[in-house]
From Swiss-Prot:
Family label: Belongs to the universal ribosomal protein uL29 family.
HAMAP family attached to this UniProt entry: Ribosomal_uL29
InterPro entries: Ribosomal_protein_uL29, Ribosomal_uL29, Ribosomal_uL29_CS, Ribosomal_uL29_sf
Keyword entries, A-Z: Ribonucleoprotein, Ribosomal protein
A single MF term (Gene Ontology): structural constituent of ribosome
Gene: rpmC
Organism: Herminiimonas arsenicoxydans
Name assigned to this protein: Large ribosomal subunit protein uL29
Length: 63
């Protein structure tokens, strides 16, 4: 997901996206804990997507 895609969304859509990503991150962490996740780079991607969403949300709040 690119930041330019996120900047076109409104605050409600960004909040929903953030909640979805946080749920995905929790699921991936549980899979790592139970040793079911083979591709651990997925967690890194989700973590960075969360950071992107939060950054765009903060930028919109500052305006």
């Amino acid at each position: 997901m690119k930041a330019s895609e996120l900047q076109g969304k409104d605050q409600a859509a960004l909040t929903k996206e953030l909640n979805d990503l946080l749920k995905a991150q929790f699921g991936l962490r549980m899979q790592i804990a139970t040793q079911q996740l083979n591709n651990t780079s997925q967690l890194k991607k989700v973590r960075r997507d969360i950071a992107r969403v939060k950054t765009v949300m903060n930028q919109k709040d500052a305006k």
